[in-house]
């Protein structure tokens, strides 16, 4: 565990390409080995071990796919970042240890292919001069300090998670969190900081994200029309049968995760519209955002709507000033209060703690139980990945044992020690992504999406174990590092014109 997380941490901190990619390779190889050891005696893995031919065929297929992807990314430099963001939310149900886990299999393949491509370009004798760390890695002293602390805190998060697995109440879950989420996402962060981000490339990412969002929205509309779900038909389908409304989850296992990614896409489009000139492209972006908003409404995800509002207010603050954002926030609160009073929803669903707990799917009990867990072990916590197991053993058995709040999860699992890393990480991350974000649509989009992501994690947890956090930090770290603008023609006039003349072009593009 320490080898996998430690390797990823070294990859984040290292400046020497040989050390960086060597450590990253160790992390990526050890992680699946950890998972294999964790599920060694499960029926499915025993079956694979008894059939070496099937196991060899599976490994060969993965290797061929990674090699093909690496070759493609080598020939098409923009392929890795655009593809990574396009597949960022795609999860496939996989049987792990007798349970169904929704894993980011497409993203894992993209990360592995990108790692192979970048490592070859950095280390191969003939390719050594073809790729160098972008100029954004040599910023001014003030920016360098913030970026350095960001990298240190991310590395500390990985190492601490590995150490606190030693006494975890659920070692198996900790291994899965590290191997399936923390380690590959840390490697993705490293790769994204290697990319020379240009306005053209960022425009391509926005188009890809919006396109994937439209596909997800279309699936959600089909589910709503058919009153049926394509994936994760268990508890959610039963819940839909008990309520007057019908929640869709598209190709996601959870409507809240579906809503999270729709909210992020809408915020990114809003940032583009805030800086764009002309009529055609902004109108098109607005139409796409409207479709995504309609799909978001069908998720009935309160947390996602709150995150969306936070992200949009961040866009307003960066584009027109904090005063307008505060006014917009006050208007939203006033409209919400009027709605609750007129509709009677506040009295019916939120009038008592019991009703509020029922309306929020048991989150009140989970949060209260999480706070009790923090109080029982305030210094070192119950160990990495242990919230569910500790809650079931020491609080009560429940269908859902996730705190739905990242700070409470960190406090319960890792105690005050973990919070000493988590809180500074949040603060430094905000400093990095917000610094200079008002200069361009690109910086504003990354910063506002990060704010939305952070707010969503306060109501639904999953922050460091969500690839969007690491991806936004990877791009934000480069955009925050000023450098001379490149001499290039943007992909489209719409993307090129996103920043009006009074504002300088973004530092890293």
Feature locations, PLM:
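Alpha-helical transmembrane segments of multi-pass inner-membrane proteins
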Residues: 1-10, 27-38, 65-67, 112-115, ...
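Transmembrane alpha-helices of multi-pass inner-membrane enzymes
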Residues: 2-11, 33, 113-117, 443-456, ...
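Aromatic-anchored transmembrane helix interface
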Residues: 56-58, 108-109, 150, 154-157, ...
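Membrane-interface helix-loop-helix junctions at transmembrane boundaries of multi-pass membrane enzymes
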Residues: 72-80, 118-152, 272-287, 319-328, ...
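A conserved mid-to-late transmembrane alpha helix and its immediate loop/hinge
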Residues: 254-256, 293-298, 366-371, 377-380, ...
